Amino acid sequence: MFDLTGMTALVTGASGGIGSAICQALAAQGARLAVSGSNVDKLEAFRASLGGDHVAVPCDLGDKDSVEALVPAALEKLGQIDILVNNAGVTRDNLTMRMKDEEWDDVIRINLEATFRLMRAATKPMMKARFGRIITITSVVGTTGNPGQANYAASKGGLTAMTKAIAQELASRNVTANCVAPGFIATAMTESLPDAQKDALNARIPMGRMGEGTDIGAAVAYLASREAGYITGQTIHVNGGMAML
């Protein structure tokens, strides 16, 4: 696909469904990875499954100190960070009138604030190297909204706007910042849904099916590549035509 040999990447939420597909896509193209997540045992098992000389760097994105320590820890193990993939995120769904403060705060803290802190830390070595790729996984919900997800929509919409601002700040240093916005992606959670519910979801998608994690991984691998060097401040929507934006 795209040759990432000699490049290094830090990926958050690495062992989840979409995160693992992203890591596999980057590793397949030759990148060396620092995989991050909060479940240490699961993370280490995933790192081992990738083969090669990839490294694991655990992090609790809900804890400020843990977030602040992540980029330095990855730099220590990798030597440099060419690619930052902000994939980790959470949901705490509820109707706005019933949403508790902690449900709002948790989503904003992990999805938006932690990503800001990681971007801030990673941009410094990228600017010094005059090369970098920042790729943030957002969501179609960040553009269209979704009932019961005011907190999640706000966090993902905020990531998109923040990416555009950072892209303008870093462009002159050959550092790009872009988003990939998935629609409905098949995961272990969606597989457990009743057939009628899956059929209803698929009916909303012109392509008639959910996407795969590999679809997101391919988009990330492209944006991480040297070939994507003239693309910045953009969002690639990967949703089977569900929302044509």
Which residue ranges define each predicted feature?
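Conserved glycine-rich cofactor-binding loop
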Residues: T8, S15-G16
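Substrate-binding pocket helix/loop in short-chain dehydrogenase/reductase
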Residues: L95-T96, K100-I108, T190, L201
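Active-site helix of classical SDR
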Residues: M119, S155, T163
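Alpha-helical segment proximal to the catalytic Tyr-Lys
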Residues: K124, Q168-S172, G229
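Residue(s) in the substrate-gating loop at a strand-loop-helix junction
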Residues: S139
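Short, small/polar-rich loop/turn modules that mediate ligand/substrate recognition or access, typified
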Residues: A171, T176, I231-G233, N239
